[in-house]
Amino acid sequence: MPPKFDPNEIKVVYLRCTGGEVGATSALAPKIGPLGLSPKKVGDDIAKATGDWKGLRITVKLTIQNRQAQIEVVPSASALIIKALKEPPRDRKKQKNIKHSGNITFDEIVNIARQMRHRSLARELSGTIKEILGTAQSVGCNVDNRHPHDIIDDINNGVVECPAS
């Protein structure tokens, strides 16, 4: 027999899903079925919570306590950059591996770095800013109409000042 269900126990489940869509509930079922939750209801809740992130792959953190699920969106750096580009959502099924040829400001990069600061491995904010610039390079966008790696070189040479915190 399984152990008795403890109503105060908190379980945390991380899921990758596409924003604004109800993922296949068959994928949710093995993860949250044993915790006494309905996969269909949780799928609808996730779709509602990720409405702002339409068409982007994001991580969702489910905190489950007493058969209630709290949903928290944990966006990746690339998802934040693509959202900052303000591109219209594209059809995932038609286009794969899209290069985003937009342009964002250095201030937006700094804001994204501040949001990602707690998850970064860098010691200072300037290191986190360089991480985000590297991600911007991978996404394929420009920063202040320049290639992101040129800005990284400028930060290393002291030409561009990074905020302290």
From Swiss-Prot:
* Residues modified as Phosphoserine: S38, S165
Which InterPro entries does the UniProt record give?
Ribosomal_uL11, Ribosomal_uL11_C, Ribosomal_uL11_C_sf, Ribosomal_uL11_CS, Ribosomal_uL11_N, Ribosomal_uL11_N_sf
For this UniProt record, give its keywords in alphabetical order, as a comma-separated list: Acetylation, Cytoplasm, Isopeptide bond, Phosphoprotein, Ribonucleoprotein, Ribosomal protein, RNA-binding, Ubl conjugation
Q: What is its main location?
A: cytoplasm
Q: Name one GO cellular component term.
A: cytosolic large ribosomal subunit
The UniProt entry, under Pfam families, shows: Ribosomal_L11, Ribosomal_L11_N
Q: Where in the cell is it found?
A: Cytoplasm
Example GO biological process term? translation
User: Which residues form the Glycyl lysine isopeptide (Lys-Gly) (interchain with G-Cter in ubiquitin) crosslink?
Assistant: K48, K83
Q: Which domain of life is it from?
A: Eukaryota
Position of cross-link Glycyl lysine isopeptide (Lys-Gly) (interchain with G-Cter in SUMO2)?
K40
Q: Say which family it is in.
A: Belongs to the universal ribosomal protein uL11 family.
Purpose of the protein: Component of the large ribosomal subunit. The ribosome is a large ribonucleoprotein complex responsible for the synthesis of proteins in the cell. Binds directly to 26S ribosomal RNA.
Describe its assembly: Component of the large ribosomal subunit. Mature ribosomes consist of a small (40S) and a large (60S) subunit. The 40S subunit contains about 33 different proteins and 1 molecule of RNA (18S). The 60S subunit contains about 49 different proteins and 3 molecules of RNA (28S, 5.8S and 5S).
The molecule here is called: Large ribosomal subunit protein uL11
Q: Report the gene name.
A: RPL12
